[in-house]
Amino acid sequence: MPILEISDLSKNFGGLKAVTGFSLTLEENEIVGLIGPNGAGKTTIFNLITGIFPVSSGSIKFMGKSILGMPPYKITQLGIARTFQNIRLFKKCTVLDNVRTVFHPRINYGLLDSFLRIARYSAEEERITARSLELLKTMNLADRAEMTAANLPYGDQRRLEIARALAGEPKLLLLDEPAAGMNPSEVGTLVELIRFIRDHFKITILLIEHQMGVVMNVCERLVVLDFGEIIAAGLPEEIRNNKKVLEAYLGKGVTVA
């Protein structure tokens, strides 16, 4: 059974057609890239999947169940997590606490337990801290656990946001331009990290990214959008060699590394 099935999805903002007739099926443990120019509708699709925007028409099924009309928090509980173009962190909190907060909606103790500091509270807090540190280690951030998030370099903030998404224990991870603002060394590390996340956590990944070197190296399939419609889909090599796609949506004379 596919993990995500989107059929004939459309979204209108008044008279503006942001997404038209978008269809996509994701199988378990795939890494699929969603590419296209700014304003093509990529992030709008993420917002439709996660319930931030209501759908104008079409269907979205996650693990065989319709998620249309569900509030974002319920969609998150089902197992869909995402990152954002503009990093969303608790900037005044520590790196560790940024991850710990994601676990707290699923804690196994009550208010009285925390007030009295009983054994169940202590054990659960220790488990949350240990799990958070494991995720920070995966992101190469364990040595910065006590730093304030605002003081992290930009690339580290990106990785912290991914750690927060993973703390929700998702089955589907939506990454919105994770390489934005990273230097070439950080981008290379990110490519390996995305593969590791898929393999280690057994997660399906849908990725929006403008850096073609990233999507060509890490994605198994690519879907190209323009003006809210799919204009090409296929293997990275097929997209790489599609002259129309390169000229119309990546710019004339672009060479994909």
Question: Model features per residue range: what roles?
Answer:
Residues 1-257:
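Glycine-rich phosphate-binding loops of nucleotide-dependent enzymes
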